[in-house]
Amino acid sequence: FPTRRSSDLAICKAGMLFITLPSGRSLSYVRPRLTQNRFGGESIEYLGIGPAKKWERIESYGPKFVENIVQGISRDLLCEAMLKLRDRRIVAHVHDEVIVEADLETPVQEVCDAMAQCPSWAEGLLLRADGYECSYYRKS
């Protein structure tokens, strides 16, 4: 990934924390604030939808933000792959998988090659895709 200053990646603006992903898309956190957690350490709280399906303050910490960033980048990579496969009949996607309904003559490797193409915003990232043929969906 291209090197950027950390000050370019996260910004607080108008009561929101925006974390910019390499794709240019942003993760958004509503009304963030630094707080002290139950162990006496520093944590970050923001407004989000809680288990009761109502707005509430959610406590988070560094590794959780890293997890959100990794999941966001993974989602962006999957979307890029799906755009490359838009001429195929994508019937579903599950996490990092694309499920394509295709003629028996369609080579699986063709779909794998499309998924392994690195987007310009992730230049240098090593991608590989594995695939298989079956007559119904199953987890490999």
Q: What feature does the model see in each segment?
A:
Residues 4-140:
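Conserved catalytic core of nucleotide polymerization and phosphodiester-bond processing enzymes
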